[in-house]
Amino acid sequence: MQIHAADHVLPITSDPIGHGAVAVDGSTVAAVGTLDELRLRYPDSPVVDHGAAAILPGFVNCHSHLEITSMRGALDDVEHDFRSWLLKLNGLRAELSDEDICAAAVAGAAEGAAAGVTCFGDIGRMGHAGLAALKQVGLRGIVFQETEFSPDNRTADDDFLKLATKYEQLKLKETDLVRVGLSPHSPYTVGSRLFELIAQYAILNRVPLTIHAAESADETELLAKGTGLFKGFYDKFELEWNSPHCTPIEYLERLGVLSTRPLLAHCVRVSVSDLSKIKANGAKIAHCPKSNAKFGHGYAPFEQMLDAGVIVGLGSDSVASNNVCDLLEESRFAALTARNRDGSERFITAQEILETATLGGAKALGLDTEIGSLEPGKQADLTVISLSNIAQGPISDVHTALVFASNSRDVAMTMVAGKEIYRSAAEA
């Protein structure tokens, strides 16, 4: 048993605790309260006092691509054209060896740990790279084996067999901390027949799914009209595209994919009707505001998602499109852009965005019975954020100090399942 104390403890599911503490017993949280209370309850337990800091649940980055960490900045010259960005990404990826990709994934995982992330929802063409990286760094997460470019219904059965084989091989490597799922990339890169096969398999075998959906205007145009930049993918490979004449969310519902309760990444171009369908099917959303903005895709209606009762978590996306994995920075950007939307009557609070970055992400990945809040019996996944920087004080409200005056460089310590996986030089 060890007690971690700080000026502020944020359980997330209850009010902040001043002069608070968290008792950690093995891999779990034993108790949360004031330091005085926990000292009385556990008089023989050592105390680690982090001082001017906040202890909160570890951040859950529910949408990332760790295996392309080495492409940070390499695609910035084409990000004004999403189709060109995707083509260049695949070209550069083809030049990397397996060793390169595995090393990139480890670097990305370590960056996340140093930023207070304790859990990832990571997507990879080489799923084993992300899985090995999370294991090596000591992180928790779900690694989603991604499809290749597979829009041709004529090859759907073969494409599915290859994907299922990769998934089943990956599943043999699951641990208590790292689990696996599937990621049919998007409505514009995966054929309808393959989507149906994956959905049937996921329901039968209880496989978690994540999908890029309604990310860009190009995607919505392709599905609604059968035209636009993404039609070029089909023309390039001499493939036929029969437009379903609907939104991406309606399309996924028609194919039975929404009934698998997938985690939908981005959802920039969604209507009130789309959100209603997402909620009704129990699907979730990974909100990636910085990546969306960097591409110029638009503002995802974050506040409308919350008002609709949809489960929402935060994602950094890859550092090839965002450049950093910093959930504090992502939180700040999410709050500011939501507040600044024209016609928005919803004022997102710092408390709401911290809940989204922790418990929201845990719910989005289906892990909220284990992580996402500091409660007795839950896993001891936590981060300690220093509040001693001159630019952070005075601390009038700990939520606003964290969201609007802190970033990943203020992370002092990160713990997963009771094991410290990162400690800053200042904290050492």
Language-model segments: residues:
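C-terminal cap of metal-dependent C-N hydrolases
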Residues: 379-428
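Active-site gating loops and adjacent loop-to-helix segments of metal-dependent hydrolytic enzymes
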Residues: 70-103, 137, 142-152, 216-261, ...
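N-terminal metal-binding scaffold of metallo-dependent hydrolase/deaminase domains
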Residues: 1-41, 53-55, 419
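Histidine/acidic residue-rich metal-binding segments in metalloenzymes
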Residues: 44-46, 132, 160-284, 296-312, ...
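Active-site beta-loop-alpha junctions enriched in small/polar residues
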Residues: 65, 125-126, 146-150, 183-187, ...
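Alpha-helical scaffold segments that flank or form the walls of functional sites
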Residues: 54-55, 73-138, 160-175
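His/Asp/Glu-enriched, well-ordered alpha-helical/loop segment
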Residues: 255-257, 300-389, 405-406
